[in-house]
Regions:
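Aromatic-Pro/Gly-enriched surface loop or interdomain linker
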Residues: 271-352, 385, 490
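Extracellular ligand-binding/catalytic regions of CAZymes and related secreted enzymes
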Residues: 19-24, 155, 175-218, 284-292, ...
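Catalytic beta-strand/loop cores that center a nucleophilic Ser/Cys/Thr
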Residues: 403-492
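Beta-strand-rich binding/interaction modules
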Residues: 55-84, 100, 112-114, 143-150, ...
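Eukaryote-biased detector of low-complexity, proline/serine/threonine-rich segments
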Residues: 92-161, 250-260
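A glycine-rich, often tryptophan-bearing local segment used as a flexible ligand/cofactor-contacting loop or short
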Residues: 354-435
Length: 492
């Protein structure tokens, strides 16, 4: 009984002058009509991804759960060309209509990616072209399919987003967004590659296919003075989703230099320079993110002392990979391996970020670490939060963490102990090394420490008191204990 009255209201709203609220109320009342009719409309792609100007098969499903006279007149889209021979279908009560394997040509001109990442933003601000998307967790309908219906003689259209779905043995029916991706993407695993001498490095480039039987070439663009060999390489990938890895030799110039290393793919007469990241968690829709494919390459003169470094993993950082790039041998140390005998093989030991928050065994291993330092080792502990430490005895002397931090990555850094060897050996550290910081100076700096510690750096946010606990060094026995809350891990 409600549907005829709602249709009458819909017709009356249609007669109103054009305006924002007219459009809002038309959509709302169309939704009420669909709800009262128990109307189910769905468009499902047979694959999760497609490429520009490719083919995609769509299955249309429609159900009318009411006594209303409903006819599906047509289905169309701005991006998919459905066959013009699609005939009208009468939607009888509780009789499912399935139009299977409707082939179409994909005309979508953009790639799928979170709208706030499509263009480079500024510090603290994303660049969004379509202001209607701002604040939305996802872009509004990416691939709307328009269902043209006649309900009790009244013409209505409904938009449904094209989706991909499959049956999971555990989760059941799983829905995922349907995406348009490049025909090929590329990636360089190491995002920062450091050349500490003039020797060449072998750089692997991984090419991922976005379609079956993909053939093309890849080359590396680099700053002036860098040598790439070979100049380009061919690739051939049989199956969509598979990848191929090609190795390039990259030689730095003799002088110090830095810039971007960019893999450029050529397929047919088109070039592609994107890298694909997939974010897949149960609590959010699957996200396929396209970013510029690139790595930073740096040729810098670095003096290196020692050879073997031990690394105790915390919450995760790229410290080991970065140290390996400049020639160190880095060995991961499991908590059970923290013994005097095992530790003595290392010239230095680095403790990963938040290890004293996340590794319970460290509550019992600190005496072994202190003994290592006492016998001549160097122990560098990165930041931990002041809350829920597994032990408060994480240093050989008094050391108390606070919530002090410096969030402005451009804040001035003062060298409190410019002659200290930590700033001069084996490489000289100056204020210039703190320029072009990526994000914040550091956090959870100690605010109380024993007289044995020397504060090395001072820093503060504008209008705040200078903090001096960002980098503390103390001799202990024959070695050194270093604690730092500086966000080195964000710079790597």
């Amino acid at each position: 009984l409600m549907i005829p009255k709602l249709l009458d209201a819909y017709k009356l709203i249609l007669k109103l002058p054009q305006g924002h609220w007219k459009e809002v109320k038309l959509e709302e009342i169309k939704g009420l009509i669909a709800d009262c009719a128990g109307l189910y409309l769905e468009a499902v792609a047979d694959q999760q991804n497609a490429v520009k100007n490719g083919e995609v098969k769509v299955t249309i499903e429609a159900i009318n759960r009411s006594n209303s006279d409903i006819e599906l007149g047509s289905v169309n889209s701005m991006f998919i060309s459905f066959p013009t021979s699609l005939k009208p279908y009468e939607l009888k009560k509780n009789k499912k209509i399935i139009i299977e394997s409707v082939a179409g040509t994909f005309n979508y001109q953009n790639y799928s990616s979170p709208y706030w990442l499509n263009k480079k933003g500024t510090i603290g601000m994303y660049h969004v072209d379509d202001k209607n998307n701002i604040g939305l967790p996802e872009k509004m309908m990416s691939f709307p399919i328009v269902f043209q219906l006649t309900i009790n003689g009244t013409y209505l259209s409904y938009n449904r987003n094209l989706v991909y779905k499959f049956n999971d043995p555990v989760k059941g029916e799983v829905y995922q967004p349907f995406d348009v991706l490049p025909i090929a993407t590329a990636s360089i695993q190491e995002k920062v590659i450091i050349f500490s001498d003039n020797n060449a490095k072998q750089i692997p480039v991984t090419v991922r296919a976005g379609k079956d039987n993909l053939n093309g070439s890849v080359k590396l663009e680099s700053p002036n003075g860098w040598l790439i060999s070979p100049e380009s390489q061919m690739f051939s990938i049989t199956k969509n989703g598979d990848d191929a890895t090609l190795i390039f030799s990259v030689t730095p110039p003799k002088n110090q230099s830095e810039g971007k290393l960019i893999p450029v793919l050529t397929v047919g007469n088109q070039s592609h320079q994107k890298e694909l990241f997939t974010i897949d968690y149960d609590y959010i829709p699957l996200q396929q993110v396209l970013l510029n494919a690139e790595a930073k390459i740096v040729h810098i003169s670095i003096e290196k002392k020692g050879e073997n470094i031990g690394y105790i993993k915390g919450a995760g950082d790229a410290i080991p990979e970065s140290l390996e790039q400049i020639g160190y041998r880095v060995t991961s140390i499991n908590p059970s391996e923290i013994t005097s005998k095992n530790l003595n093989q290392f010239d230095a030991i680095v403790v990963g970020i938040r290890a004293y928050n996340t590794v319970p065994e460290l509550a019992f291993k600190q005496p072994e670490l202190n003994s290592y330092v006492e016998n001549g080792g160097t122990l560098l502990v990165q930041y931990n939060t002041s809350h829920r430490l597994v032990t408060n005895e994480f240093a050989p002397y008094q050391l108390t963490l606070s919530r002090d931090r410096v969030t402005d990555e451009f804040s001035e850094v003062t060298l409190l102990a410019p002659d200290h060897q930590v700033l001069n050996y084996p490489n000289r550290i100056t204020r210039a090394d703190f320029e072009n910081w990526v994000q914040e100076r550091g956090l959870y700096f100690p605010n109380k420490w024993g007289k044995e510690f020397t504060p090395i750096l001072g820093m503060s946010d504008k209008g705040s008191k200078q903090t001096k606990g960002s980098l503390l060094v103390a001799p202990y026995g024959k070695g050194y204990y270093i604690y730092t809350g500086i966000s080195f891990f964000r710079e790597l």
